[in-house]
Amino acid sequence: MAIKKLGFVAVMTAGLLVLTGCASGPNNGVDQSKVDKAAQALLPAEYLDNGIDVASDIPYEPFEYLDENGDLTGVDVELINLIGQKLGTEIRINDAVFDTIIASLESGTNDIIISSMSDTVERQAKVDFVDYNIGGSQMIVAKGNPENITNPMSLCGKTVIVQNGTIQIDLIGTMSESCKVSGKKEITLTQLPDAPSMQNALRAGQGDAVMMDSFVAQGAAAKAGNGEYFDVVSDPEAPNGYDAGFVGIAILKKDTGLRDAIQAALQSLIDDGQYADLMAKWNMSANAVVSASVNGTKE
């Protein structure tokens, strides 16, 4: 069953997560002992006083999703909560559609994005990224891999499902061009709005594979139908996934003060070990960054 857009705001202060229809007062519940004063000093007053609105496309497990109790969780959720603690301000997570998620910053609906968003040169034209992870793409297929999909060339002539607005669109386009150059049939691309829709389409036989974030693919294969619905295609030529690169928190280019404060807060989490603990908790240590860089992806 596809999960509908949630329409809630998740308010997080000092490690407490509450699902609510509106925010309480600014800075309520902030534990000042966890604040990094140097990072906080970089934060423009409007965000210190009013909090930070965060756009996230939910669900996208293990980055942002609802657990069995209906609580919002995931590595992105926990990380932005820790950043809020370092800055001493309130974090409000707002559900957003991924292919219009940058537009939600431009309209003023949200201030930043944390949604397993790849740091790309194209996106850097509109936003800056504070990079916090290294990720790639992998495929899931129906259990037993009936189409014997093992690598990009085995996708030639097949239908691949991806999410709207993601880097996987260009990735499949490049793979399809390789098929054409090799004299094989091109790949048919199907775009859908979210991870549940993609999984449902694959189960319904509307595609031969889904290309998605590696960690999301692994989680889907392990959990969907208690592990009975999907397999992950593990390509030895791409052990970290296809097109592995930086994943970042996105901030509009004009909001340099907010960007610098978030970068400093993330660096503080790296320095005090909380970031390493978080990545270990979510089995992502191999994908951790060593420092909080801005726009790490280059031409």
Q: Which residue stretches match the model-derived regions?
A:
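C-terminal motif of bacterial Sec signal peptides marking the signal peptidase cleavage site
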Residues: 16-21
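Extracytoplasmic small-molecule ligand-binding "clamshell" domains
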Residues: 29-116
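Ligand-binding clefts/hinges and TM-proximal coupling segments of bilobed small-molecule sensing domains
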Residues: 24-37, 41-43, 167-186, 229, ...
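A ligand-binding cleft/hinge motif common to bilobed small-molecule-binding domains
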Residues: 117-124, 171-178, 208-243
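Bilobed "Venus flytrap"/periplasmic-binding protein-like clamshell domains
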Residues: 58-61, 72-85, 138-194, 199, ...
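Acidic, polar ligand-binding/catalytic clefts
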Residues: 90-154
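Periplasmic-binding protein-like
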Residues: 58, 134-141, 225-264, 285-299
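Extended ligand-binding regions for polar small-molecule ligands
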Residues: 23, 77-86, 153, 159, ...
